[in-house]
Swiss-Prot record:
HAMAP family: eIF3b
UniProt xrefs under PROSITE patterns: RRM
Role summary: RNA-binding component of the eukaryotic translation initiation factor 3 (eIF-3) complex, which is involved in protein synthesis of a specialized repertoire of mRNAs and, together with other initiation factors, stimulates binding of mRNA and methionyl-tRNAi to the 40S ribosome. The eIF-3 complex specifically targets and initiates translation of a subset of mRNAs involved in cell proliferation.
Region (Disordered): 1-43
Domain of life, per lineage: Eukaryota
Disulfide bonds: none
Oligomeric and partner information: Component of the eukaryotic translation initiation factor 3 (eIF-3) complex, which is composed of 13 subunits: eif3a, eif3b, eif3c, eif3d, eif3e, eif3f, eif3g, eif3h, eif3i, eif3j, eif3k, eif3l and eif3m.
SUPFAM superfamilies per record: DPP6 N-terminal domain-like, RNA-binding domain, RBD
Protein's UniProt name: Eukaryotic translation initiation factor 3 subunit B
Compositional bias per record (Acidic residues), positions renumbered to this chain: 10-26, 33-43
Intracellular or extracellular location(s): Cytoplasm; Cytoplasm, Stress granule
Domain (RRM): residue spans on this chain: 61-144
Mapped WD repeat ranges: 164-206, 208-246, 248-293, 297-335, 338-373, 436-492, 525-570, 635-680
């Protein structure tokens, strides 16, 4: 029985196999005869083909270097070593080609990098590299030659742009009363106003809502007012404060002007990328063009770039490097940075292209302060220092003196002492004098246009202020010292001689007004919780203020004379910031200024007469203003009465014919009251 079943099973299995073969033939995935595939290689092999060599890959990585020395075979190897040393800094060199003719090189070479980005970096940084007195490299991408060869012969004349007349950008200097302007931000930043200063009350010039999103800043000479916006910076100026220029820099937070007002530096933490540095941008103010972008290190302090006094150079410090750039090219001076191991800080002289920097101690090598002349990079003075903890550089406004505040720990002692190293910059070989103080230093400040400096030292509550004078023979004399001062900041008048000792914030706004000609305290006052002190550019007035940004109540600014007499108290809702508008340097020579000071008594009589006339003028202006207000009220009253009478018919219809005007009038209950006020006038006899 089992044997009889076997054939049947075999037949069944064979039948199943034949069915499977038939199904496989019906489901065949083979292409029919004559089939043409319309799928491209890019669709099938896109991930592989994207890495295939491109025709332009090699060309994009090739640079051409001109003005290379022409040498023979005996010096070719040496030339190659020099070229590799210079250009390998920008990336890996894969090929070099030195064309030759008649036994020497032709003066230009071809270099190929591993990546196009490396070639672009070489062009950017090596173009203009000075090899020696006779050879300055000109570096271009090889692809640039094709680009410039296909330029057509036809030239399209650019459209002439209309001239934008912004008016007189220094119109505020022509004020007949020689007043100064200042900006005020209040209502927690929603409103910004510009005022003329006046003894009685500020005179408004311009007021706008949401003029800036954070704060404002004046340019160094007062020409422009900068406002901050999420999309960038706007500059305003002229009599009506029209928009002069705008710079698009998303998320900008900080700015800085060059001293010459030609360039603007902006910083945004949002824009930086590895491919295109945009964290810091330097702009040309006149054209609005982006001159150059830079990366920003996370540990940097603003301003990252520091400008020379004339705006010709700017510099930045990175690890063991001081990079100095020149304008208008925005390239590195001499195409290379200064390698200064351990450099901690640097500062430009306000009176010349001299840069000061200091380096801390390193094992047995002492700390040193170096003065270097630019652009020659000549060291004009080096000062070695020992046991140094920290140094601070303080320049006098004219660059006549440099004070290096040196904190050090003498051997064998646990405490710290401070030396003031005074460099006399205008004398041969730059002699240095030293003042030593054992107290802790709170503040130091030079007299702007003189040879005195003030120091706050000690600890609360025994804080002292000392005044020193640098004599012509180099001797530093202590003029005066006051004990028990409530101050943590020194504010010199821009013209010198007078200063304010202020105890800001935690010291509750204590103020001392000092005349340093004889070191007398002219007045002691207080502006409770004051956060800021601002001198006007002429040194006539001082403003103290309580900013809403630091203290949420009692927000106001007070105006004082330089002698400490309070003139005004101006309360502004959520007052934030006040800044005086700077003035450009005087056009008068020093001899002319001395002559004016000599004849000051003669001019003072004229000024006193003008003050009296201004008071009389103010009274007349008050009368005219009140008359104008009365006329405005009368006009409005007549218009309202006319409208009221025109609507009487409609009122009667609404109220069913009842004249409610008569019901509500109650004329018999009215009381009439007359108010009189008297305005005095001063009559000044004019002598013939």
């Amino acid at each position: 029985m089992l044997e009889s079943e076997r054939p049947e099973r075999d037949m069944e299995e064979e039948g199943e196999e034949s069915n499977e073969e038939e199904e496989e033939e019906g489901m065949s995935f083979s292409d029919p005869e004559g089939f043409e595939d319309d799928i491209s290689d890019e669709e099938l092999l896109g991930d592989i083909l994207k890495d295939r060599p491109q025709e332009a890959d090699g060309i994009d990585s090739v640079i051409v270097v001109d003005n290379v020395p022409q040498v023979g075979p005996d010096r070719l190897e040496k030339l190659k070593n020099v070229i590799v040393k210079i250009f390998s800094k920008f990336g890996k060199l894969t090929n070099e080609f030195y064309p030759q003719a008649e036994g020497s090189t032709k003066g230009y070479i071809f270099l190929e990098y591993a990546l196009p980005a490396q070639a672009q970096d070489a062009v950017k940084n090596a173009d203009g590299y000075k090899l020696d007195k006779q050879h300055t490299f000109r570096v271009n991408l090889f692809t640039d030659f094709d680009k410039y060869m296909v330029i057509g012969d036809e030239w399209d004349v650019p459209e002439k742009q209309p001239f934008k007349d912004f008016g007189n950008l220094r119109s505020w200097l022509e004020d007949p009363d020689c007043r100064d302007q200042f900006s005020v931000i209040y209502e927690s930043g929603d409103r910004t106003s510009i005022f003329w200063t006046d003894v009685k009350e500020p005179v408004p010039v311009e007021e706008r809502a949401r003029w800036t999103e954070t704060y404002v800043r004046w340019s160094p000479k007062g020409t422009y007012l900068a406002t901050f916006h999420q999309r960038g910076i706007a500059l305003w100026g002229g009599e009506k404060f029209k928009q002069i220029q705008r710079f698009s820099h998303q998320g900008v937070q900080l700015i800085d002007f060059s001293p010459c007002e030609r360039y603007l530096v902006t910083f945004s933490p949002l824009m930086d990328t590895k491919e295109e540095p945009q964290a810091i941008i330097i702009w040309d103010i006149l054209t609005g063009h982006n001159k150059r972008g830079f990366h920003c290190e996370s540990s940097a302090h603003w301003p990252i770039f520091k400008w020379s006094h004339d705006g010709k150079f700017f510099a930045r410090m990175t690890l063991d490097t001081l990079s100095i750039y020149e304008t208008p090219s925005m390239g590195l001076l001499d195409k290379k940075s200064l390698k200064i191991t351990g450099i901690k800080d640097f500062s430009w002289s306000p009176g010349g292209n001299i840069i000061a920097f200091w380096v801390p101690e390193d094992k047995d090598i002492p700390a040193r302060v170096t003065l270097m002349q630019m652009p020659t990079r000549q060291e004009i003075r080096v000062r070695n220092l020992f046991n140094v903890v920290d140094c601070k550089l303080h320049w006098q406004k004219n660059g006549d003196y440099l004070c290096v505040k040196v904190d050090r720990t003498p051997k064998g002692t646990q405490g710290m002492v401070t030396n003031f190293e005074i460099f006399r910059m205008r004398e041969k070989q730059v002699p240095v004098d030293v003042v030593e103080m054992k107290d802790g230093i709170i503040a130091f400040a030079w007299e702007p246009n003189g040879s005195k400096f003030a120091v706050l030292h000690g600890e609360v509550p025994r804080i002292s202020v000392s005044f020193y004078h640098v004599k012509n023979n180099g001797k530093i004399e202590l003029i005066k010292m006051y004990d028990k001062q409530q101050a943590n900041t020194i504010f010199w008048s821009p013209q010198g001689q007078f200063l304010v000792l202020a105890g800001l914030r935690s010291m509750n706004g204590a103020l001392a007004f000092v005349d340093t000609s004889d070191c007398t305290i002219m007045n002691i006052a207080e502006h409770y919780t004051a956060s800021d002190v601002e001198w006007d550019p002429t040194g006539r007035y001082v403003i103290t203020s309580v900013s809403w940004w630091s203290h949420k109540v009692d927000n106001a600014y007070w105006m004082w004379t330089f002698q400490g007499r309070l003139l005004q108290k101006n309360n502004k809702d959520r007052f934030c910031q006040l800044l005086w508008r700077p003035r450009p340097p005087s056009l008068l020579s020093q001899d002319q200024i001395k002559q004016i000071k000599k004849d000051l008594k003669k001019y003072s009589k004229i000024f006193e007469q003008k003050d009296r006339l201004s008071q009389t003028k103010a009274s007349k202006e008050l009368i005219e203003r009140r008359r104008a207000m009365m006329e405005e009220y009368k006009t409005y009253r007549e218009m309202a009465t006319k409208l009221y009478m025109e609507q009487k018919t409609a009122r009667l219809e609404i109220r069913g014919g009842v004249d409610t005007d008569l019901l509500d009038s109650n004329v018999e209950d009215w009381e009439e009251e007359t108010i009189e006020f008297f305005v005095t006038e001063e009559i000044i006899p004019v002598e013939e």
